[in-house]
Amino acid sequence: MFRMLSSSFEDDPFFADSFLAHRESMRNMMRSFSEPLGRDLLSISDGRGRTHNRRERDDGEDSLTHADVNPFQTMDRMMANMRSGIQELQRNFGQLSMDPNGHSFCSSSVMTYSKVGDEPPKVFQASTQTRRAPGGVKETRKAMRDSDSGLERMAVGHHIHDRGHVIRKSKNNKTGDEEVNQEFINMNESDAHAFDDEWQNEVLKYKSIGRSGNTGMRSVGHEHPGSRELKRREKIHRNSAIESGRRSNVFVDKLNVKGSPVKITKK
């Protein structure tokens, strides 16, 4: 299951080293769990000084025992089918994201948690997000946290067609080491500021289009007779509530209640 969900992360250089180290740690932990149970479970005594010997069973019993173990194979087949479905979904989304005139958003994440004895829990988290807009505009976000090694990483990339500017930050909470790197794709470092402005302008252009479209939809809706009637009723209700509030204030003023303040103690 973990392999199925993390395959896309393992192929990414940003996550690859951390995933390999984490997987090896998980293997060692699972190996330590399986060692006490490594002997043949069918040779366990039945409590009366006798053992179950699989070889002494007839073919019918042996096939029955084989059938009892096969649910694990059923689970494997189910996971394989799930893996195929996810891969097909990723292929379809990949084709959709290549449309130069479309918007798309893709997000993937994986998390593992393990705790052995009195040791502190080990948490591993990784996530990646990709947003695309027409005109070759793209933003990528990646993050990873490993409590075992104390390492935290994040990367944010802005892209326009084949040009890109990626900023990566990393910090080791155990050693206190911090590092910041920048990557310039198909451009010089001196062009980074102008590229960032260009990327922001492209993003704002599509945001303004979205706002104008929503405003147009609201304007059309207000012209509908039902909307006008609903607006009129809301106005009447609002005026009635204001008038009622005024009367309540007058009534309170007439009461002219006097007294000493009471101190309230919160527990």
Curated annotation (Swiss-Prot):
One of its GO terms (biological process) is DNA-templated transcription. It is found in: Cytoplasm; Nucleus; Cell projection, Cilium; Cytoplasm, Cytoskeleton, Cilium basal body. Keywords: Cell cycle, Cell projection, Cytoplasm, Cytoskeleton, Developmental protein, Differentiation, DNA-binding, Nucleus, Phosphoprotein. Residues 50-125 are annotated as: Interaction with COPS3. Phosphorylation is required for binding to YWHAZ. Changing S149A: No effect on binding to YWHAZ. Highly expressed in skeletal muscle, heart, testis. Also found in lung, but not in spleen, thymus, bone marrow, liver and kidney. Induction: Expression is activated by FOXJ1. Pfam families: Mlf1IP. The modification Phosphoserine is found at S6, S8, S32, S34. GO terms for molecular function: DNA binding. Residues 39-67 are annotated as: Disordered. The keyword RNA-binding does not apply. One of its GO terms (cellular component) is motile cilium. Interacts with CENPU. Also interacts with NRBP1/MADM, YWHAZ/14-3-3-zeta and HNRPUL2/MANP. NRBP1 recruits a serine kinase which phosphorylates both itself and MLF1. Phosphorylated MLF1 then binds to YWHAZ and is retained in the cytoplasm. Retained in the nucleus by binding to HNRPUL2. Binds to COPS3/CSN3 which is required for suppression of COP1 and activation of p53. Belongs to the MLF family. Involved in lineage commitment of primary hemopoietic progenitors by restricting erythroid formation and enhancing myeloid formation. Interferes with erythropoietin-induced erythroid terminal differentiation by preventing cells from exiting the cell cycle through suppression of CDKN1B/p27Kip1 levels. Suppresses COP1 activity via CSN3 which activates p53 and induces cell cycle arrest. Binds DNA and affects the expression of a number of genes so may function as a transcription factor in the nucleus. This is Myeloid leukemia factor 1. It comes from Mus musculus (Mouse).
